[in-house]
Regions:
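Cell-envelope and extracellular/periplasmic
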Residues: 27, 33-34, 68, 99-103, ...
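Well-ordered, non-membrane alpha-helical segments in soluble/globular domains
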Residues: 42-47, 75-85, 143-162, 211-228
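Hydrophobic, aromatic-enriched interface-forming segments
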Residues: 147-198
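Histidine-centered active-site loop/cap adjacent to the catalytic His
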Residues: 260-292
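Substrate-gating cap/lid alpha-helix
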Residues: 185-242, 274
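Oxyanion-hole/transition-state-stabilizing segment in secreted/luminal serine hydrolases
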Residues: 80-148, 180-190
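Short amphipathic alpha-helices and their capping/turn segments at secondary-structure boundaries
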Residues: 13-19, 76-97, 156-171, 228-231
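Serine-esterase "nucleophile elbow" of acetyl-processing enzymes
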Residues: 1-68
């Protein structure tokens, strides 16, 4: 197996750009922090792209940066480099797009809190809105807010695929992945970055006993939304979702504030954790490309 060779946009645009013709598969990558830095400690840093392996040589130009959300991938003013490489004067013909989408969007959307915020703009309910305890962690979810979130994701994927289809790589396959289930805990990336999930659960007064179950439900709901979007081939042609929910990832311990299980911090995996997802995802991608 051959590891994915990852380049930055700056390398590709330099006076001596790398020759991409060696690769059987040439990807343009964009997304959130699962494609960039998982921690500020270089000895423990990895990402999903670094752990991908293919049967044939493959390379990717990675436009992602920490904190990216799906909207930024589609807004020219926020990420002109990605758009230029996809459909602008610097565009290449790509064999596929690699996308890490939805995770940071979910984290951002969970921050909305309080009865003063309409339910359609909140993913979680206020304490006095909670349903019956018999419903488990689902009693904390705002159905109206999740519908808004789904509409938001769909609009952004439609925009992104529109950018794809306006350039020389029109119709090329776009590949997105699911996420693993994090443990809400006080484990950031250093220098004040994170935790990301825990503060929102605390702000919503979610009982500690339900943190793990709610985190699992949030990831399951996000996976369902992404899977449904990819399944709608009419609105979102040649978009492929790799479901990671059945892959066994060693969970972190709730009270551990450092590396724990397959997690380097609250929402980012160790190199070993990423490899558990990246290797089968790469195999699925290669299967699509070989069948094209």
């Amino acid at each position: 197996m051959k590891p994915l060779t990852v380049y930055t946009p700056e390398q590709v645009s330099s006076s001596m750009p790398p020759d991409l013709s060696f690769a059987a598969y040439r990807f343009l990558a964009e997304g959130d922090s699962w494609f960039t830095l998982s921690t500020l400690n270089p000895a423990h840093n990895s990402n999903l792209l670094f752990e991908m392996q293919f049967e044939q040589f493959a390379c990717a130009v990675n436009c992602a940066y920490p904190g990216d959300t799906l909207a930024r991938m589609c807004e020219m003013n926020s990420d002109p480099v990605f758009v230029q490489l996809l459909r602008g004067r610097r565009a290449h013909i790509w064999d596929g797009l690699l996308l890490s989408c939805g995770g940071n969007d979910l984290v951002d959307a969970l921050k909305a809190v309080g009865n003063g915020v309409p339910r359609a703009q909140r993913l979680l309910l206020a304490r006095d809105e909670w349903g019956d305890a018999a419903h488990g962690p689902a009693r904390y979810l705002s159905p109206e807010g999740w519908q808004t979130f789904n509409t938001y994701l769909q609009a952004n994927f439609a925009h992104l695929l529109g950018l794809r289809d306006a350039g020389p790589s029109a119709g090329c396959p776009a590949f997105m992945h699911g996420y693993a289930c994090p443990t809400p805990r006080n484990a950031g990336a250093g220098f004040g970055l994170g935790p990301w999930l825990l503060p929102s659960l605390q702000a919503h007064d979610i009982p500690r006993a339900d943190w793990l179950a709610l985190a699992a439900l949030l990831m399951h709901e996000l996976g369902d939304l992404l899977e449904a979007i990819a399944a709608d081939g009419v609105r979102f042609p040649n978009l492929h979702f790799f479901d990671t929910r059945a892959i066994e990832i060693m969970p972190a311990t709730l009270d551990d504030e450092g590396e724990s299980g397959d997690w380097v911090n609250e929402i980012h995996l160790t190199a070993n954790g990423y490899a558990k997802l990246a290797v089968p995802w790469a195999a699925a991608i290669e299967g699509v490309l070989q069948g094209a």
